């Protein structure tokens, strides 16, 4: 099993510490039960927009080219450094689950595909308790989640899970345009999204 460290950037109250570590433990257990693995990414917990801004600015060159992060982001994942950064004052359980899923996804998937897979599986794992799923913007739903839902209906849940982990492969040419777009180079995908908005 994988192991990750949790680092709090600033002093937390006992209740805040307990909430964060409980969310991480429960999310990791859900992921392990469903996928049979869990992330080894370290988790950095920050509080407030200033701490999040420092994290974003310090790693902006590691983040994906088309992605736009703000201090309002609840969480981000830095694949190069294998770190998940969570802004605990605004993150809900679903944000922790979503980012921890990012940590187990196949390394060769482009960012937008990882984003879609992570939100899709967050939705699947929170289905019994839908209140745990954060509300998603129309952009996230249309760009990431809807195409992955279509992919799941074609491939089936088991195969999609293997594919998400990087243990199975697909020929994206066989799918509709919205699904194929998830396989584009990141720069092309995000340029198209900005241009056609």
Task: Write out the residue ranges for each language-model feature.
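Auxiliary, metal-adjacent structural segments of Zn-dependent hydrolase domains
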Residues: 12-90, 110
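Active-site recognition of the HExxH zinc-binding catalytic motif
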Residues: 94-107, 118-119
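A generic hydrophobic-helix recognition signal that picks specific residues
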Residues: 91-95, 108, 195-197
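Stable alpha-helical elements in mature extracytoplasmic
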Residues: 23, 27, 92, 96, ...
């Amino acid at each position: 099993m994988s192991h990750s460290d949790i680092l709090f950037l600033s002093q937390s109250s006992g209740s805040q510490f307990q909430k964060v570590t409980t969310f991480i433990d429960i999310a990791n257990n859900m992921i392990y039960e469903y996928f049979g693995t869990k992330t080894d990414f370290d988790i950095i917990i920050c509080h407030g927009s200033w701490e999040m801004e420092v994290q974003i600015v310090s790693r902006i060159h590691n983040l994906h080219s088309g992605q736009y992060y703000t201090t309002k982001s609840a969480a981000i994942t830095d694949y190069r450094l294998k770190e998940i950064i969570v802004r605990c004052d605004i993150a809900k359980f679903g944000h922790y689950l979503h980012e921890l899923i990012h940590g187990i996804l196949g390394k060769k998937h482009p960012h937008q595909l990882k984003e879609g897979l992570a939100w899709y599986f967050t939705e699947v794992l929170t289905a019994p308790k839908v209140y745990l799923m954060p509300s998603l913007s129309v952009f996230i739903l249309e760009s990431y989640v809807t195409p992955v839902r279509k992919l799941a209906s074609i491939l089936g849940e088991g195969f999609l899970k293997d594919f998400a982990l990087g243990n199975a492969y697909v020929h994206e040419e066989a799918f509709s345009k919205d699904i194929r777009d998830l396989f584009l180079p990141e720069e092309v995908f995000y340029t198209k999204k900005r241009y056609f908005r």
